Amino acid sequence: MTDQTTRLPVRRALISVSDKTGILEFARELQQLGVEILSTGGTYKLLKDNGVNAVEVADYTGFAEMMDGRVKTLHPKIHGGILGRRGVDDAIMNEHGIKPIDLVAVNLYPFEATIAKPGCDLPTAIENIDIGGPTMVRSAAKNHKDVAIVVNASDYASVLEGLKAGGLTYAQRFDLMLKAFEHTAAYDGMIANYMGTIDQAKDTLSTEARSEFPRTFNSQFVKAQEMRYGENPHQSAAFYVEAKKGEASVSTAIQLQGKELSFNNVADTDAALECVKSFVKPACVIVKHANPCGVAVVPEDEGGIRKAYDLAYATDTESAFGGIIAFNRELDGETAKAIVERQFVEVIIAPKISQAARDVVAAKQNVRLLECGEWPAERAAGWDFKRVNGGLLVQSRDNGMITAEDLKIVTKRAPTEQEIHDLVFAWKVAKFVKSNAIVYAKQRQTIGVGAGQMSRVNSARIAAIKAEHAGLQVQGAVMASDAFFPFRDGIDNAAKVGISAVIQPGGSMRDAEVIAAADEAGIAMVFTGMRHFRH
Protein backbone atom coordinates (compact mmCIF):
# COMPACT_ATOMS: atom_id res chain seq x y z
CA MET A 1 0.00 0.00 0.00
CA THR A 2 1.33 3.46 -0.93
CA ASP A 3 2.36 5.68 1.98
CA GLN A 4 -0.04 8.64 1.88
CA THR A 5 2.16 10.97 3.93
CA THR A 6 5.73 10.42 2.70
CA ARG A 7 6.89 13.53 0.86
CA LEU A 8 8.81 13.24 -2.41
CA PRO A 9 11.08 16.15 -3.31
CA VAL A 10 11.30 17.65 -6.80
CA ARG A 11 14.76 18.01 -8.32
CA ARG A 12 13.84 18.47 -11.97
CA ALA A 13 10.73 20.02 -13.54
CA LEU A 14 9.49 20.43 -17.09
CA ILE A 15 7.42 23.54 -17.77
CA SER A 16 5.55 24.09 -21.06
CA VAL A 17 2.33 26.08 -20.90
CA SER A 18 -0.02 27.85 -23.29
CA ASP A 19 -1.77 29.74 -20.49
CA LYS A 20 1.11 31.53 -18.80
CA THR A 21 -0.89 32.85 -15.86
CA GLY A 22 1.36 32.75 -12.80
CA ILE A 23 4.01 30.62 -14.48
CA LEU A 24 6.85 33.11 -14.08
CA GLU A 25 6.34 33.37 -10.33
CA PHE A 26 5.98 29.58 -10.09
CA ALA A 27 9.24 28.99 -11.98
CA ARG A 28 11.12 31.54 -9.89
CA GLU A 29 10.02 29.82 -6.70
CA LEU A 30 11.07 26.44 -8.10
CA GLN A 31 14.46 27.86 -8.99
CA GLN A 32 14.89 29.23 -5.47
CA LEU A 33 14.17 25.72 -4.18
CA GLY A 34 17.02 24.40 -6.32
CA VAL A 35 14.86 22.73 -8.95
CA GLU A 36 16.37 22.31 -12.42
CA ILE A 37 13.91 23.57 -15.03
CA LEU A 38 13.42 22.27 -18.56
CA SER A 39 11.21 24.25 -20.91
CA THR A 40 10.08 24.71 -24.52
CA GLY A 41 9.23 27.40 -27.06
CA GLY A 42 7.41 30.46 -25.82
CA THR A 43 7.55 29.34 -22.20
CA TYR A 44 11.34 28.98 -22.36
CA LYS A 45 11.66 32.45 -23.91
CA LEU A 46 9.45 34.00 -21.22
CA LEU A 47 11.47 32.40 -18.44
CA LYS A 48 14.83 33.27 -19.99
CA ASP A 49 13.84 36.89 -20.68
CA ASN A 50 12.85 37.26 -17.04
CA GLY A 51 15.96 35.82 -15.49
CA VAL A 52 14.88 32.25 -14.83
CA ASN A 53 17.69 29.81 -15.58
CA ALA A 54 15.93 27.19 -17.69
CA VAL A 55 17.29 24.55 -20.07
CA GLU A 56 15.60 24.36 -23.46
CA VAL A 57 14.28 20.88 -24.19
CA ALA A 58 16.03 20.81 -27.58
CA ASP A 59 19.39 21.35 -25.84
CA TYR A 60 18.55 18.71 -23.24
CA THR A 61 17.54 16.03 -25.77
CA GLY A 62 20.03 17.02 -28.46
CA PHE A 63 17.14 16.95 -30.91
CA ALA A 64 15.90 20.25 -32.34
CA GLU A 65 12.24 21.18 -32.68
CA MET A 66 10.92 20.27 -36.12
CA MET A 67 7.88 20.40 -38.38
CA ASP A 68 6.93 23.93 -37.27
CA GLY A 69 6.96 22.90 -33.64
CA ARG A 70 4.83 19.79 -34.09
CA VAL A 71 7.66 17.70 -32.63
CA LYS A 72 9.27 19.16 -29.52
CA THR A 73 8.93 16.93 -26.49
CA LEU A 74 8.22 13.58 -28.15
CA HIS A 75 11.58 12.09 -27.19
CA PRO A 76 12.69 9.15 -24.96
CA LYS A 77 14.76 11.46 -22.74
CA ILE A 78 11.57 13.36 -21.94
CA HIS A 79 9.05 10.55 -21.68
CA GLY A 80 11.54 8.13 -20.18
CA GLY A 81 12.28 10.74 -17.52
CA ILE A 82 8.57 11.11 -16.79
CA LEU A 83 7.48 7.47 -17.06
CA GLY A 84 10.53 5.88 -15.47
CA ARG A 85 9.59 4.03 -12.28
CA ARG A 86 11.92 4.94 -9.47
CA GLY A 87 13.60 1.83 -8.09
CA VAL A 88 12.45 -0.25 -11.08
CA ASP A 89 13.74 1.45 -14.23
CA ASP A 90 16.84 3.13 -12.76
CA ALA A 91 19.33 0.90 -14.61
CA ILE A 92 17.81 1.39 -18.05
CA MET A 93 17.50 5.13 -17.42
CA ASN A 94 21.18 5.35 -16.48
CA GLU A 95 22.17 3.28 -19.50
CA HIS A 96 20.49 5.74 -21.86
CA GLY A 97 21.37 8.92 -20.00
CA ILE A 98 17.77 9.60 -19.01
CA LYS A 99 17.35 11.82 -15.96
CA PRO A 100 14.18 11.59 -13.87
CA ILE A 101 11.68 14.43 -14.25
CA ASP A 102 9.81 14.84 -10.98
CA LEU A 103 7.30 17.54 -11.88
CA VAL A 104 5.52 18.43 -15.12
CA ALA A 105 3.66 21.74 -15.44
CA VAL A 106 1.73 21.70 -18.70
CA ASN A 107 -1.50 23.13 -20.04
CA LEU A 108 -2.69 22.70 -23.58
CA TYR A 109 -3.08 24.65 -26.81
CA PRO A 110 -6.20 26.87 -26.66
CA PHE A 111 -8.34 24.74 -28.96
CA GLU A 112 -11.63 26.03 -27.53
CA ALA A 113 -10.64 29.69 -27.98
CA THR A 114 -9.43 28.97 -31.51
CA ILE A 115 -12.62 27.35 -32.79
CA ALA A 116 -14.71 30.08 -31.15
CA LYS A 117 -13.14 32.71 -33.38
CA PRO A 118 -15.24 33.81 -36.37
CA GLY A 119 -14.00 32.27 -39.60
CA CYS A 120 -11.94 29.52 -37.98
CA ASP A 121 -11.37 26.85 -40.62
CA LEU A 122 -10.42 23.20 -40.25
CA PRO A 123 -6.65 23.60 -40.91
CA THR A 124 -6.44 26.31 -38.24
CA ALA A 125 -8.33 24.12 -35.78
CA ILE A 126 -6.08 21.15 -36.52
CA GLU A 127 -2.90 23.16 -35.89
CA ASN A 128 -4.27 24.01 -32.46
CA ILE A 129 -4.68 20.37 -31.45
CA ASP A 130 -1.98 19.75 -28.86
CA ILE A 131 -0.09 16.47 -29.17
CA GLY A 132 3.03 16.75 -27.05
CA GLY A 133 1.19 18.42 -24.18
CA PRO A 134 -1.46 15.73 -23.59
CA THR A 135 1.20 13.05 -24.04
CA MET A 136 3.31 14.53 -21.26
CA VAL A 137 0.26 15.12 -19.08
CA ARG A 138 -0.88 11.51 -19.43
CA SER A 139 2.63 10.15 -18.91
CA ALA A 140 3.08 12.13 -15.71
CA ALA A 141 -0.42 11.26 -14.50
CA LYS A 142 0.18 7.56 -15.12
CA ASN A 143 3.40 7.72 -13.10
CA HIS A 144 1.92 9.89 -10.34
CA LYS A 145 3.52 7.59 -7.78
CA ASP A 146 6.81 9.31 -8.63
CA VAL A 147 5.82 12.43 -10.61
CA ALA A 148 3.64 15.46 -9.91
CA ILE A 149 1.57 16.76 -12.83
CA VAL A 150 0.24 20.33 -12.65
CA VAL A 151 -2.32 21.43 -15.26
CA ASN A 152 -4.07 24.25 -13.36
CA ALA A 153 -2.44 27.55 -12.43
CA SER A 154 -4.65 27.53 -9.34
CA ASP A 155 -2.54 24.64 -8.01
CA TYR A 156 0.83 26.40 -8.21
CA ALA A 157 0.58 27.85 -4.70
CA SER A 158 -0.32 24.56 -2.99
CA VAL A 159 2.42 22.71 -4.91
CA LEU A 160 5.01 25.25 -3.79
CA GLU A 161 3.73 25.02 -0.24
CA GLY A 162 4.19 21.25 -0.33
CA LEU A 163 7.68 21.49 -1.79
CA LYS A 164 8.72 23.97 0.89
CA ALA A 165 7.51 21.45 3.47
CA GLY A 166 9.86 18.83 2.04
CA GLY A 167 7.98 17.50 -0.97
CA LEU A 168 4.58 16.43 -2.22
CA THR A 169 2.66 13.65 -0.51
CA TYR A 170 1.08 10.80 -2.45
CA ALA A 171 -2.34 12.23 -1.64
CA GLN A 172 -1.33 15.51 -3.29
CA ARG A 173 0.08 13.75 -6.34
CA PHE A 174 -3.04 11.59 -6.63
CA ASP A 175 -5.27 14.67 -6.61
CA LEU A 176 -3.08 16.33 -9.26
CA MET A 177 -3.24 13.14 -11.33
CA LEU A 178 -7.03 13.15 -11.24
CA LYS A 179 -7.14 16.78 -12.34
CA ALA A 180 -4.78 15.92 -15.20
CA PHE A 181 -6.97 13.13 -16.57
CA GLU A 182 -10.04 15.37 -16.18
CA HIS A 183 -8.16 18.03 -18.14
CA THR A 184 -7.20 15.74 -21.04
CA ALA A 185 -10.64 14.12 -21.10
CA ALA A 186 -12.30 17.53 -21.48
CA TYR A 187 -9.76 18.53 -24.13
CA ASP A 188 -10.26 15.39 -26.22
CA GLY A 189 -14.02 15.63 -25.80
CA MET A 190 -13.94 19.19 -27.11
CA ILE A 191 -11.97 18.12 -30.18
CA ALA A 192 -14.28 15.16 -30.82
CA ASN A 193 -17.34 17.42 -30.52
CA TYR A 194 -15.88 19.87 -33.03
CA MET A 195 -14.72 17.25 -35.52
CA GLY A 196 -17.99 15.39 -35.15
CA THR A 197 -19.94 18.37 -36.49
CA ILE A 198 -18.05 18.48 -39.79
CA ASP A 199 -19.91 17.04 -42.77
CA GLN A 200 -17.26 15.50 -45.01
CA ALA A 201 -19.72 15.39 -47.89
CA LYS A 202 -19.64 19.18 -47.89
CA ASP A 203 -16.81 21.69 -47.75
CA THR A 204 -14.81 20.62 -44.69
CA LEU A 205 -13.00 23.96 -44.66
CA SER A 206 -16.20 25.92 -44.12
CA THR A 207 -17.75 26.58 -40.73
CA GLU A 208 -21.14 26.82 -42.46
CA ALA A 209 -20.85 23.15 -43.42
CA ARG A 210 -20.89 22.05 -39.80
CA SER A 211 -23.77 20.15 -38.21
CA GLU A 212 -25.31 21.49 -35.03
CA PHE A 213 -24.97 18.15 -33.26
CA PRO A 214 -21.73 16.11 -33.16
CA ARG A 215 -21.58 12.39 -33.91
CA THR A 216 -20.75 11.72 -30.27
CA PHE A 217 -21.65 14.15 -27.51
CA ASN A 218 -18.98 14.92 -24.92
CA SER A 219 -19.52 17.24 -21.98
CA GLN A 220 -17.80 17.55 -18.63
CA PHE A 221 -19.42 18.41 -15.32
CA VAL A 222 -17.73 18.85 -11.95
CA LYS A 223 -19.22 17.52 -8.74
CA ALA A 224 -20.25 20.47 -6.62
CA GLN A 225 -22.09 18.62 -3.89
CA GLU A 226 -23.07 15.17 -2.71
CA MET A 227 -26.64 15.16 -1.46
CA ARG A 228 -28.35 13.32 1.37
CA TYR A 229 -30.66 11.74 -1.19
CA GLY A 230 -32.23 12.34 -4.58
CA GLU A 231 -35.75 13.20 -5.63
CA ASN A 232 -36.88 10.60 -3.09
CA PRO A 233 -35.13 9.33 0.07
CA HIS A 234 -34.33 5.91 -1.42
CA GLN A 235 -32.36 7.53 -4.30
CA SER A 236 -28.72 8.62 -4.04
CA ALA A 237 -27.75 11.92 -5.68
CA ALA A 238 -25.09 14.52 -6.37
CA PHE A 239 -25.09 17.95 -8.00
CA TYR A 240 -22.70 18.45 -10.91
CA VAL A 241 -22.03 21.81 -12.52
CA GLU A 242 -20.49 22.82 -15.83
CA ALA A 243 -16.71 23.06 -15.65
CA LYS A 244 -16.81 26.48 -17.28
CA LYS A 245 -19.01 28.94 -15.41
CA GLY A 246 -21.67 30.65 -17.48
CA GLU A 247 -24.27 33.27 -16.67
CA ALA A 248 -25.80 33.66 -13.23
CA SER A 249 -27.68 30.50 -12.29
CA VAL A 250 -28.39 28.14 -9.43
CA SER A 251 -25.13 26.43 -10.41
CA THR A 252 -23.07 29.57 -9.85
CA ALA A 253 -25.00 30.95 -6.87
CA ILE A 254 -23.32 31.47 -3.50
CA GLN A 255 -25.23 30.11 -0.51
CA LEU A 256 -25.10 32.68 2.28
CA GLN A 257 -26.94 30.69 4.93
CA GLY A 258 -29.28 27.78 5.55
CA LYS A 259 -29.30 24.02 5.33
CA GLU A 260 -27.56 22.21 2.51
CA LEU A 261 -29.49 22.37 -0.76
CA SER A 262 -31.44 19.22 -1.56
CA PHE A 263 -31.94 17.65 -4.98
CA ASN A 264 -35.45 19.10 -5.22
CA ASN A 265 -34.27 22.49 -3.91
CA VAL A 266 -31.81 22.78 -6.79
CA ALA A 267 -34.37 21.77 -9.42
CA ASP A 268 -37.05 24.11 -8.07
CA THR A 269 -34.65 27.01 -7.57
CA ASP A 270 -33.52 26.67 -11.16
CA ALA A 271 -37.14 26.82 -12.34
CA ALA A 272 -37.84 29.93 -10.24
CA LEU A 273 -34.70 31.79 -11.23
CA GLU A 274 -34.98 31.04 -14.95
CA CYS A 275 -38.58 32.27 -14.90
CA VAL A 276 -37.80 35.53 -13.09
CA LYS A 277 -34.99 36.23 -15.56
CA SER A 278 -37.67 36.68 -18.23
CA PHE A 279 -38.79 39.99 -16.75
CA VAL A 280 -37.10 43.38 -17.05
CA LYS A 281 -39.13 45.22 -14.40
CA PRO A 282 -39.00 44.17 -10.72
CA ALA A 283 -40.51 40.70 -10.43
CA CYS A 284 -41.12 37.89 -7.97
CA VAL A 285 -41.63 34.23 -8.84
CA ILE A 286 -42.76 31.59 -6.34
CA VAL A 287 -42.27 27.97 -7.42
CA LYS A 288 -43.52 24.68 -6.00
CA HIS A 289 -42.60 21.34 -7.56
CA ALA A 290 -40.94 23.11 -10.51
CA ASN A 291 -44.14 25.01 -11.40
CA PRO A 292 -44.70 28.74 -10.86
CA CYS A 293 -47.59 29.06 -8.41
CA GLY A 294 -47.39 32.85 -8.19
CA VAL A 295 -45.73 35.52 -10.33
CA ALA A 296 -46.01 39.30 -10.35
CA VAL A 297 -44.25 42.28 -11.91
CA VAL A 298 -44.40 45.72 -10.26
CA PRO A 299 -42.49 48.84 -11.40
CA GLU A 300 -40.14 50.43 -8.86
CA ASP A 301 -42.34 53.52 -8.41
CA GLU A 302 -45.34 51.31 -7.62
CA GLY A 303 -43.71 49.16 -4.96
CA GLY A 304 -41.06 47.09 -6.74
CA ILE A 305 -40.22 43.62 -5.45
CA ARG A 306 -41.90 44.24 -2.10
CA LYS A 307 -45.28 44.64 -3.79
CA ALA A 308 -44.45 41.96 -6.38
CA TYR A 309 -43.94 39.44 -3.57
CA ASP A 310 -47.31 40.31 -2.02
CA LEU A 311 -49.09 39.79 -5.35
CA ALA A 312 -47.22 36.59 -6.23
CA TYR A 313 -47.99 35.14 -2.80
CA ALA A 314 -51.66 36.11 -3.11
CA THR A 315 -52.04 33.96 -6.24
CA ASP A 316 -51.85 30.71 -4.26
CA THR A 317 -51.02 31.05 -0.58
CA GLU A 318 -51.37 27.32 0.05
CA SER A 319 -48.92 26.25 -2.67
CA ALA A 320 -46.46 28.97 -1.68
CA PHE A 321 -45.92 27.18 1.65
CA GLY A 322 -42.51 25.50 1.49
CA GLY A 323 -41.85 27.04 -1.91
CA ILE A 324 -38.90 28.69 -3.62
CA ILE A 325 -38.90 32.47 -4.09
CA ALA A 326 -36.85 34.23 -6.77
CA PHE A 327 -36.35 37.93 -7.46
CA ASN A 328 -34.67 39.84 -10.29
CA ARG A 329 -33.62 42.70 -8.01
CA GLU A 330 -31.59 42.98 -4.82
CA LEU A 331 -33.47 41.52 -1.87
CA ASP A 332 -34.02 44.26 0.70
CA GLY A 333 -34.69 43.92 4.41
CA GLU A 334 -38.35 44.93 4.21
CA THR A 335 -39.17 42.27 1.61
CA ALA A 336 -37.17 39.63 3.49
CA LYS A 337 -39.09 40.48 6.68
CA ALA A 338 -42.42 40.14 4.89
CA ILE A 339 -41.44 36.68 3.63
CA VAL A 340 -40.18 35.14 6.86
CA GLU A 341 -43.04 36.56 8.92
CA ARG A 342 -45.68 35.34 6.47
CA GLN A 343 -44.65 31.90 5.27
CA PHE A 344 -42.37 28.90 5.48
CA VAL A 345 -39.89 29.11 2.60
CA GLU A 346 -37.22 26.65 1.48
CA VAL A 347 -35.03 28.90 -0.68
CA ILE A 348 -34.79 32.60 -1.51
CA ILE A 349 -32.59 33.55 -4.47
CA ALA A 350 -31.79 36.98 -5.88
CA PRO A 351 -28.97 38.62 -7.85
CA LYS A 352 -27.90 40.36 -4.64
CA ILE A 353 -28.86 40.08 -0.98
CA SER A 354 -28.62 43.26 1.11
CA GLN A 355 -27.04 43.15 4.55
CA ALA A 356 -30.40 44.14 6.03
CA ALA A 357 -32.03 41.13 4.35
CA ARG A 358 -29.27 38.84 5.62
CA ASP A 359 -29.80 40.08 9.15
CA VAL A 360 -33.54 39.45 8.91
CA VAL A 361 -33.26 35.95 7.46
CA ALA A 362 -30.50 35.00 9.92
CA ALA A 363 -33.23 34.49 12.52
CA LYS A 364 -34.53 31.62 10.34
CA GLN A 365 -31.41 29.48 10.17
CA ASN A 366 -32.92 26.76 7.99
CA VAL A 367 -33.88 29.15 5.18
CA ARG A 368 -31.44 28.79 2.31
CA LEU A 369 -30.37 32.23 1.08
CA LEU A 370 -28.70 32.32 -2.33
CA GLU A 371 -26.99 35.19 -4.16
CA CYS A 372 -26.54 34.49 -7.86
CA GLY A 373 -25.24 37.78 -9.30
CA GLU A 374 -26.57 39.76 -12.25
CA TRP A 375 -27.32 38.21 -15.63
CA PRO A 376 -27.12 39.71 -19.13
CA ALA A 377 -30.25 40.91 -20.89
CA GLU A 378 -29.51 38.56 -23.79
CA ARG A 379 -29.81 34.93 -22.76
CA ALA A 380 -26.84 32.75 -23.65
CA ALA A 381 -27.30 29.89 -26.08
CA GLY A 382 -26.80 26.43 -24.67
CA TRP A 383 -28.11 22.88 -24.49
CA ASP A 384 -30.88 21.22 -22.55
CA PHE A 385 -30.76 17.51 -21.76
CA LYS A 386 -33.37 14.92 -20.91
CA ARG A 387 -32.30 11.45 -19.89
CA VAL A 388 -34.26 8.49 -21.23
CA ASN A 389 -33.51 4.85 -20.59
CA GLY A 390 -30.49 4.05 -22.74
CA GLY A 391 -30.16 7.50 -24.24
CA LEU A 392 -30.01 11.26 -23.93
CA LEU A 393 -32.22 13.81 -25.66
CA VAL A 394 -30.30 16.97 -26.50
CA GLN A 395 -31.87 20.19 -27.71
CA SER A 396 -31.01 23.86 -27.94
CA ARG A 397 -32.14 25.92 -24.96
CA ASP A 398 -35.61 27.44 -25.30
CA ASN A 399 -34.57 31.09 -25.45
CA GLY A 400 -37.45 31.99 -27.72
CA MET A 401 -39.59 34.89 -26.53
CA ILE A 402 -42.01 37.28 -28.17
CA THR A 403 -42.72 40.97 -27.74
CA ALA A 404 -45.94 42.89 -28.29
CA GLU A 405 -44.78 43.67 -31.83
CA ASP A 406 -44.66 39.94 -32.66
CA LEU A 407 -48.31 39.27 -31.84
CA LYS A 408 -50.75 38.46 -34.62
CA ILE A 409 -54.29 39.59 -33.86
CA VAL A 410 -56.68 36.96 -35.25
CA THR A 411 -60.05 38.05 -33.83
CA LYS A 412 -62.43 40.85 -34.69
CA ARG A 413 -61.65 42.63 -31.43
CA ALA A 414 -58.08 43.74 -30.88
CA PRO A 415 -56.71 43.59 -27.32
CA THR A 416 -56.42 46.83 -25.39
CA GLU A 417 -53.02 48.19 -24.40
CA GLN A 418 -53.43 46.84 -20.85
CA GLU A 419 -54.51 43.46 -22.19
CA ILE A 420 -51.40 43.33 -24.40
CA HIS A 421 -49.19 44.00 -21.37
CA ASP A 422 -50.96 41.24 -19.47
CA LEU A 423 -50.87 38.83 -22.42
CA VAL A 424 -47.11 39.17 -22.83
CA PHE A 425 -46.68 38.77 -19.06
CA ALA A 426 -48.86 35.65 -18.96
CA TRP A 427 -47.04 34.20 -21.97
CA LYS A 428 -43.68 34.57 -20.22
CA VAL A 429 -45.04 32.72 -17.20
CA ALA A 430 -46.69 29.96 -19.26
CA LYS A 431 -43.30 29.13 -20.78
CA PHE A 432 -42.19 27.87 -17.35
CA VAL A 433 -45.35 25.96 -16.40
CA LYS A 434 -45.48 22.21 -17.03
CA SER A 435 -47.60 21.31 -20.06
CA ASN A 436 -50.44 21.45 -20.59
CA ALA A 437 -50.07 24.97 -19.21
CA ILE A 438 -52.74 27.60 -18.72
CA VAL A 439 -52.08 30.92 -16.98
CA TYR A 440 -54.69 33.48 -15.97
CA ALA A 441 -53.28 36.95 -15.31
CA LYS A 442 -54.47 40.46 -14.55
CA GLN A 443 -52.51 43.66 -14.00
CA ARG A 444 -49.26 41.67 -14.41
CA GLN A 445 -50.17 39.29 -11.63
CA THR A 446 -50.97 35.61 -12.02
CA ILE A 447 -54.41 34.90 -10.61
CA GLY A 448 -54.61 31.22 -11.54
CA VAL A 449 -52.21 28.60 -12.88
CA GLY A 450 -53.28 25.26 -14.35
CA ALA A 451 -50.31 22.93 -14.82
CA GLY A 452 -49.42 19.47 -15.99
CA GLN A 453 -52.82 18.22 -17.10
CA MET A 454 -53.27 15.76 -19.94
CA SER A 455 -56.23 17.82 -21.18
CA ARG A 456 -55.74 21.52 -21.94
CA VAL A 457 -59.31 22.38 -21.03
CA ASN A 458 -58.78 20.78 -17.61
CA SER A 459 -55.74 23.00 -17.04
CA ALA A 460 -58.00 25.97 -17.83
CA ARG A 461 -60.59 24.74 -15.34
CA ILE A 462 -57.93 24.33 -12.66
CA ALA A 463 -56.66 27.88 -13.27
CA ALA A 464 -60.20 29.17 -12.72
CA ILE A 465 -60.61 27.07 -9.57
CA LYS A 466 -57.30 28.38 -8.21
CA ALA A 467 -58.34 31.99 -8.84
CA GLU A 468 -61.70 31.48 -7.15
CA HIS A 469 -60.07 29.75 -4.17
CA ALA A 470 -57.65 32.66 -3.78
CA GLY A 471 -60.50 35.17 -3.95
CA LEU A 472 -59.09 36.76 -7.12
CA GLN A 473 -61.38 38.22 -9.78
CA VAL A 474 -61.14 36.43 -13.13
CA GLN A 475 -63.50 38.83 -14.89
CA GLY A 476 -61.37 40.89 -17.29
CA ALA A 477 -58.28 38.69 -16.89
CA VAL A 478 -56.27 37.29 -19.80
CA MET A 479 -55.35 33.68 -20.52
CA ALA A 480 -52.10 32.22 -21.89
CA SER A 481 -51.76 28.71 -23.30
CA ASP A 482 -48.33 27.18 -23.96
CA ALA A 483 -49.65 25.36 -27.05
CA PHE A 484 -52.59 25.69 -29.42
CA PHE A 485 -56.16 24.84 -28.50
CA PRO A 486 -57.16 21.68 -30.37
CA PHE A 487 -60.86 22.42 -29.84
CA ARG A 488 -63.00 25.43 -29.06
CA ASP A 489 -63.92 24.11 -25.59
CA GLY A 490 -60.92 25.86 -24.02
CA ILE A 491 -62.18 29.22 -25.29
CA ASP A 492 -65.78 28.46 -24.35
CA ASN A 493 -64.64 27.66 -20.82
CA ALA A 494 -62.60 30.89 -20.69
CA ALA A 495 -65.62 32.92 -21.78
CA LYS A 496 -67.74 31.43 -18.99
CA VAL A 497 -65.34 32.62 -16.28
CA GLY A 498 -64.85 36.10 -17.78
CA ILE A 499 -61.54 35.91 -19.65
CA SER A 500 -61.24 38.95 -21.94
CA ALA A 501 -58.19 38.09 -24.07
CA VAL A 502 -56.17 35.01 -25.02
CA ILE A 503 -52.60 34.43 -26.17
CA GLN A 504 -51.61 31.12 -27.77
CA PRO A 505 -49.30 29.84 -30.52
CA GLY A 506 -51.98 28.96 -33.06
CA GLY A 507 -51.40 26.23 -35.60
CA SER A 508 -54.30 23.89 -34.86
CA MET A 509 -56.30 22.27 -37.65
CA ARG A 510 -59.29 23.85 -35.92
CA ASP A 511 -57.91 27.37 -35.54
CA ALA A 512 -60.90 28.75 -37.45
CA GLU A 513 -63.32 27.17 -34.95
CA VAL A 514 -61.28 28.45 -32.00
CA ILE A 515 -61.20 31.98 -33.46
CA ALA A 516 -64.94 31.84 -34.10
CA ALA A 517 -65.52 30.87 -30.47
CA ALA A 518 -63.48 33.89 -29.34
CA ASP A 519 -65.39 36.21 -31.68
CA GLU A 520 -68.73 34.90 -30.41
CA ALA A 521 -67.67 35.72 -26.84
CA GLY A 522 -66.09 39.08 -27.70
CA ILE A 523 -62.69 37.78 -26.63
CA ALA A 524 -59.58 39.25 -28.22
CA MET A 525 -57.07 36.61 -29.27
CA VAL A 526 -53.49 36.80 -30.52
CA PHE A 527 -51.19 34.15 -31.98
CA THR A 528 -47.48 34.00 -31.18
CA GLY A 529 -46.42 31.41 -33.74
CA MET A 530 -44.20 29.90 -31.04
CA ARG A 531 -44.93 26.94 -28.76
CA HIS A 532 -43.47 26.43 -25.27
CA PHE A 533 -44.06 22.80 -24.29
CA ARG A 534 -42.37 21.93 -20.99
CA HIS A 535 -42.23 18.31 -19.85
Swiss-Prot record:
Keywords: Hydrolase, Multifunctional enzyme, Purine biosynthesis, Transferase. SMART domains: AICARFT_IMPCHas, MGS. Residues 6-151 form the MGS-like domain. GO terms for cellular component: cytosol. InterPro entries: AICAR_Tfase_dup_dom_sf (IPR024051), Cytidine_deaminase-like (IPR016193), MGS-like_dom (IPR011607), MGS-like_dom_sf (IPR036914), PurH-like (IPR002695). Its EC number is 2.1.2.3, 3.5.4.10. It comes from the Bacteria. Gene3D superfamilies: 3.40.140.20, Methylglyoxal synthase-like domain (3.40.50.1380). It catalyses: (6R)-10-formyltetrahydrofolate + 5-amino-1-(5-phospho-beta-D-ribosyl)imidazole-4-carboxamide = 5-formamido-1-(5-phospho-D-ribosyl)imidazole-4-carboxamide + (6S)-5,6,7,8-tetrahydrofolate; IMP + H2O = 5-formamido-1-(5-phospho-D-ribosyl)imidazole-4-carboxamide. One of its GO terms (biological process) is 'de novo' IMP biosynthetic process. Pathway: Purine metabolism; IMP biosynthesis via de novo pathway; 5-formamido-1-(5-phospho-D-ribosyl)imidazole-4-carboxamide from 5-amino-1-(5-phospho-D-ribosyl)imidazole-4-carboxamide (10-formyl THF route): step 1/1; Purine metabolism; IMP biosynthesis via de novo pathway; IMP from 5-formamido-1-(5-phospho-D-ribosyl)imidazole-4-carboxamide: step 1/1. PROSITE patterns: MGS. GO terms for molecular function: IMP cyclohydrolase activity; phosphoribosylaminoimidazolecarboxamide formyltransferase activity. The IMP cyclohydrolase activity resides in the N-terminal region. Belongs to the PurH family. HAMAP family: PurH (MF_00139). This is Bifunctional purine biosynthesis protein PurH. It comes from Pseudomonas putida (strain W619). The lineage of its organism: Bacteria, Pseudomonadati, Pseudomonadota, Gammaproteobacteria, Pseudomonadales. The gene is purH.
